[in-house]
Amino acid sequence: MIYLDNAATTLRKPPQVIDAVVAAMGSFGNSARGTHEEALAASRVIYDTRCKLAALFGCKRPDHVAFTCNSTEALNIAIHGCIHAGEHVISTDLEHNSVLRPLYRLERENNVKLSFVPADRQGNIDYADFERLLRPDTRAVVCTHASNLTGNTLDLACIGAFAHEHDLLFIVDASQSAGVLPIDMEQMHIDVLCFTGHKSLMGPQGTGGLCVREGVDINPWKVGGTGVQTYLHEQPEQMPTRLEAGTLNGHGIAGLNAALDFLQETGVETIHAHEMALLRRFVAGVKKIPGVALYGDFDHERTAVAALNIGDMDSGEVSDILSEDYGIATRPGAHCVPRLHEALGTEEQGAVRFSFGWYNTEEEADAAIAALREIAT
């Protein structure tokens, strides 16, 4: 099988990631739930992983890295915990439902007002629209770093400067960029960075988290056992305990720790360069196929994602043919980004997404081009 669905999850992990998960399953106790060696072993690895994530993302305090099951949970914690009834939020048309649905819920239940920076037919935005949409009651900007459909990226430094100038919270969804694009919370004025571990970070599924700038108070979305301050009726105030009720996924975090070592040794820039070389090769070949429509802006910084359609064929049909006849795994449909499909004019047809990863090869990119050529003729 040729796996080109890395934007959904990286199927091939560094071998040390798998080894670390297996080792942890045989040796870890429950972090912060005892002083015996097995519990302490889990605690040490979890803290070490916080430190590595803080260094990767430019978060000043490792204890402000809180673990979750994925970026969806992290975004729910950030959005529900930071935005209050009646406030106004600016977002964009590029957003995943992990951002949109929490915002829509607040709109329905808490009278939160929403404005969206529109996307054009290439999936780009006009950054001047942030100023245009600003209101006296604006509380936050919530946006993605990279589109999971087109691969287009947003200029976080530009948006962060706008948010900082107007004293707004800046919450970022880094699901598609963490581990493949440089992120610096301080330089980009990011208040809360939400990430998942199983995509470009190449860690296990069931891992993710949020990095919180010092001074940003998030009301806990869930509360419960913490292993400390048992007699408090409320969730403890200190981070990361405030946002980590219940047992952490220590086994998964051990795998994420090993993945972060691999990223450090290999280099985020090296990984991104490899993936982009494959994308450029793929796009150049696809552009020569009559009847294929590509979506997105391929002239600016982006991730290694290409979305396309063949004539008026349903995207699901194309993806099924690729899988069943050619052994190529892709992602069809709406990709949980309804507003962006509306902007691109693909809400009925959807799109077939090809997403390249570290373990893909030129031969696999060429095979995908050849398959599309046959399907299109």
Where are these regions (language model features)?
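Pyridoxal 5′-phosphate
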Residues: 1-377
